């Protein structure tokens, strides 16, 4: 019989998650994630500390393109035009997670973790992060008059990471946590 391997999350990442949770609680915000190449590692890291249910709402693992479309509402045409690993798809994933989970902050991850699957334009280690949020005015004062949907902001960021598959995925989670903390603390550019 084989002994199961235990997955351990570093103390550094746990400290980042606790800082993220504190910042989200202070704003009364909840978080959702939408992950492709990390396969739920960010959501798993976020839910490691006790009390994460106060601020973590949902994690969508949308590894396949049809999952991105079916669960997050990413248009097939967008994926066909730009590819799953693109700024446009990362943005649509983050916006879809924000809307479908009814949260104030969402982060998406799509990329090429390797060892195969890369191209000249999108080599192994290419990762796009998408960040979407509801503007603070709407979260403090409720929905705009007339029942309109709250205004959202979003941005994307391309990462080019080195290492094997595990290293690329781990680096992505660490960077994603940094970006989430900055946004939740109001330090990120909107």
Explain the meaning of each model-derived region:
Residues 1-190:
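Short alpha-helical segments enriched in small residues
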């Amino acid at each position: 019989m084989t002994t199961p391997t235990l997955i351990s999350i570093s103390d550094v990442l746990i400290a980042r998650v606790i800082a993220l949770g504190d910042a989200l609680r202070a704003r009364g915000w909840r978080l959702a994630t939408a992950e492709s190449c990390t396969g739920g590692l960010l959501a798993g890291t976020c839910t490691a500390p006790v009390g994460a249910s106060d601020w973590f709402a949902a994690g969508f693992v949308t590894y396949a393109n049809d999952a991105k479309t079916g669960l997050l509402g990413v248009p097939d045409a967008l994926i066909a035009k730009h590819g799953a690993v693109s700024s446009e798809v990362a943005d649509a994933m983050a916006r879809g997670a924000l809307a479908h989970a009814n949260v104030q902050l969402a982060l998406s991850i799509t990329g090429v973790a390797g060892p195969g699957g890369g191209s000249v334009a999108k080599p192994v280690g290419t990762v796009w992060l998408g960040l979407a949020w509801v503007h603070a005015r709407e979260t403090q004062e409720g929905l705009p008059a007339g029942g309109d949907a709250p205004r959202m902001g979003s941005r994307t960021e391309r990462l080019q990471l080195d290492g094997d598959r595990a290293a690329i995925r781990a680096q992505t989670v660490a960077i994603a946590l940094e970006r989430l903390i900055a946004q939740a603390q109001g330090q990120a550019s909107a």
